[in-house]
């Protein structure tokens, strides 16, 4: 399939970070709101908000987020940001997206956890009112923060769970804060009924994936380090765990130093539930269409595969069965021409 055909395909995305996916025009708009000077050209601005091509590791990659954080400190800024990411997704025919963010990073301007979360929800509503897309939010705990901080965040935002805020995640410095360190906050979120996904296996540490699966988390973000772990892959399949793959991001962070270290083929061969994601559209300088093209070029991924992965995403989405059915029906209809 050529790029235009890939663009036209209906898509779903489970793993997309708000702060890592703002368009350059949105970043300029947000900076203007706080009188922050930016480079005159987009090429110069990109160098500040995109991960360097020669990132040495995940920590190096995450530095690109520092530039955007001060721009997301008001309700209006968070609304605009959420709307912007929904708009980008809708423009490449994403029919369902879950956008994740850490409300704790938007408190410097005096917002509360609830106000920050509500602002993102409002931005998603505005996006859905404008575009043909279903957009949901996930709140992220940050593994480098004390468990008490993450527990407070989940306790505070759990009452907002409903039609738009649908779940939670843990992101951040995995190398120094492995899964078992986060276990108390994970268990708190689970006890509150927060559906969870979880970043694991992004730093050559398969034990973090295994521990997340053991804790009953139904979705794993990245899971890169399972590529040469057949017993772990078998456990992923056995438990029905869904994997949120992020190819471009993993190559940038060196979570996968080569395509051979990316787990797609091993997971697919084993029958695991795979989904395709951007992770961070801006930081990784990618789109979901570009990700599809990379899978097609690297692995020979077909329209039949893409449909299956999108159906996996709908199955794993934190939404009611009625919404899943309507999305599945639409995907089958939209892919009928290609499969």
UniProtKB/Swiss-Prot annotation:
Active site residues according to the UniProt entry: 202
Top-rank EC class of the record's enzyme: hydrolase
Superkingdom assignment: Bacteria
Annotated site, Important for catalytic activity, chain positions: 222
Binding site for Zn(2+): 15, 17, 199, 279
Co-factor requirement: Zn(2+)
Pfam families membership: A_deaminase (PF00962)
Ranges that cross the membrane: none
BP term (GO), one: adenosine catabolic process
EC assignment: 3.5.4.4
Protein name: Adenosine deaminase
Source species: Lacticaseibacillus casei (strain BL23)
């Amino acid at each position: 399939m050529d790029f235009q055909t890939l663009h036209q395909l209906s898509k779903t995305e489970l793993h997309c970070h708000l702060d890592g996916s703002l368009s350059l025009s949105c970043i300029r708009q947000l900076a203007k709101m706080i009188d922050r000077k930016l480079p005159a050209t987009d090429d110069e601005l990109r160098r500040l908000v995109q991960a360097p091509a020669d990132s040495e590791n995940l920590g190096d990659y995450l530095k690109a987020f520092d530039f955007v954080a001060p721009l997301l400190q008001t309700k209006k800024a968070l609304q605009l940001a959420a709307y912007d990411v929904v708009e980008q997704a809708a423009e490449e025919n994403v029919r369902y997206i879950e956008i994740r963010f850490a409300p704790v990073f938007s408190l410097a301007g005096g917002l509360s956890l609830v106000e920050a979360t509500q602002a993102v929800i409002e931005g998603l509503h505005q996006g859905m009112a404008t575009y043909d897309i279903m957009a949901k939010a996930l709140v992220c705990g940050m593994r480098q923060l004390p468990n008490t901080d993450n527990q407070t965040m989940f306790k505070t935002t759990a009452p907002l769970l409903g039609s738009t805020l649908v779940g939670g995640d843990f992101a951040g410095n995995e190398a120094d804060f492995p899964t078992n360190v986060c276990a108390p906050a994970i268990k708190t979120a689970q006890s509150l009924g927060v559906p969870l996904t979880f970043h694991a296996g992004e730093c050559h540490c398969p034990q973090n994936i295994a521990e997340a699966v053991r804790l009953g988390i139904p979705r794993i973000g990245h899971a890169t380090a399972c590529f040469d772990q057949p017993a772990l892959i078998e456990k992923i399949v056995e438990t029905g765990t869904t994997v949120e793959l992020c190819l471009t991001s993993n190559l940038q962070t060196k979570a996968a130093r080569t395509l051979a270290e990316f787990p797609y083929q091993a997971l697919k061969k084993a029958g695991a539930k795979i989904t395709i994601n951007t992770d961070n559209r801006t930081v990784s300088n990618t789109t979901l269409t570009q990700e599809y093209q990379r899978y097609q070029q690297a692995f020979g991924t077909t329209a039949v595969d893409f449909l299956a992965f999108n159906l996996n995403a709908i199955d794993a989405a934190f939404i009611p069965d009625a919404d899943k059915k309507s999305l599945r029906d639409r995907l089958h209809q939209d892919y009928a021409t290609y499969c």
